[in-house]
C-alpha cells in the first residue's frame, strides 16, 4: 500500500503556539478488496491487514483524538467477498478499523435498499448522504444529511454527496427516492454547519467523481475540503477550485481498491 501525505497548510486557521493538527485518513472505492492483490502489477499490495497496521501507526503517532478515518463510498462490490457473503464482511472490516464517517457510493445499492439497510444497521460509522431524499424508503433514519465529529479540539462537519444513481443502478431501486442538486444541498448544509453548529471546518465526502467535484466546488460556499471517490482518480497532490466567494476548495481522491491510503494533515 502506498501512503500519500498531503499537508493542507492553506487551510490553517489562526495558527499559533496553541495550534492543533488534525490528521484525516481517507479511502474510496475499496470495492470489497479485503485481501492484498493476488495478481497483476500490484500483487501483495493493499488489504485489510495492511490498512489496519497503517491506521494504527497513525493513531499511535498523532493520538487517536486527533485522527479521523473516513470513506468516500463504494466500499462494497468488486470481489467474491461481496457476492458470496452479501456485503457482511466489508461491514465487519470497517468496524474493526474504526471508521468515523462514510458516504454512500452507487455500488452500495447493488443488492437493493432492504439489503443495504440491513448492512447499515450493523455499521458503527456515521453514514452521510445529503442529495437524496430517503423518506419512506428502508434507508430512512439510517442515513444522515450531515454530521459533526469532534477531533483535535475542533468541530468538523461532514456532508455526503452521491452521484445520480439513475445512470448506474437498476431503475426499480433508483426510483425509490429523489435525487437533489448536490451544490444546492451542500450550500444549505455548509452554512448550517458553519453558522448554526459552529464547525471549524466543513468537509464533503463525495461520490460524484473528480470532474463533477470540480464543477460542484465552483458553485459552493463554506466548504473547505472535498474528499472524493467514484471516478477512481489518483491525485498525488491537492487540487484546488475557487468557490463562489473566491476561496480555495481543496479536492483529494485516492484511486481504488485500497491500493493507496490518503493522509491529510490540517493545521488550525
Predicted feature residues:
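Acidic, metal/ion-coordinating pockets
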Residues: 19-268
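Sec-dependent N-terminal signal peptides
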Residues: 4-13
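Sec/Tat signal peptide C-region and signal peptidase I cleavage site
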Residues: 13-19
Amino acid at each position: 500500500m502506498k501512503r500519500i501525505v498531503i499537508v493542507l497548510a492553506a487551510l490553517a486557521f489562526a495558527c499559533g503556539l496553541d495550534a492543533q493538527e488534525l490528521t484525516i485518513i481517507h479511502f474510496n472505492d475499496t470495492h470489497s478488496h479485503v485481501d492484498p492483490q493476488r495478481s497483476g502489477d500490484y500483487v501483495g499490495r493493499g488489504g485489510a491487514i495492511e490498512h489496519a497496521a497503517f491506521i494504527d501507526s497513525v493513531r499511535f503517532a498523532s493520538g487517536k483524538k486527533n485522527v479521523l478515518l473516513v470513506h468516500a463510498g463504494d466500499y462494497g462490490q468488486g470481489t467474491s467477498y461481496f457476492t458470496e457473503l452479501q456485503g457482511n464482511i466489508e461491514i465487519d472490516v470497517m468496524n474493526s478499523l474504526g471508521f468515523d464517517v462514510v458516504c454512500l457510493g452507487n455500488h452500495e445499492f447493488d443488492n437493493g435498499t432492504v439489503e443495504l439497510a440491513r448492512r447499515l444497521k450493523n455499521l458503527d460509522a456515521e453514514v452521510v448522504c445529503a442529495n437524496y431524499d430517503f423518506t419512506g424508503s428502508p434507508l430512512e433514519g439510517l442515513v444522515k444529511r450531515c454530521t459533526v465529529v469532534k477531533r483535535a479540539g475542533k468541530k468538523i462537519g461532514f456532508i455526503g454527496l452521491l452521484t445520480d444513481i439513475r445512470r448506474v443502478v437498476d431503475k426499480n431501486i433508483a426510483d425509490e427516492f429523489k435525487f437533489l442538486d448536490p451544490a444546492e444541498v451542500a450550500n444549505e448544509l455548509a452554512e448550517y454547519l458553519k453558522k448554526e453548529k459552529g464547525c471549524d471546518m466543513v468537509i464533503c465526502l463525495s461520490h460524484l467523481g473528480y470532474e463533477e467535484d470540480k464543477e460542484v466546488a465552483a458553485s459552493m460556499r463554506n466548504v473547505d475540503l472535498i474528499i472524493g471517490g467514484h471516478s477512481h482518480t489518483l491525485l498525488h497532490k491537492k487540487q484546488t477550485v475557487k468557490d463562489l466567494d473566491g476561496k480555495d476548495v481543496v479536492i483529494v481522491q485516492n484511486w481504488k481498491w485500497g491500493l493507496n491510503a490518503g493522509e491529510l494533515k490540517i493545521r488550525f
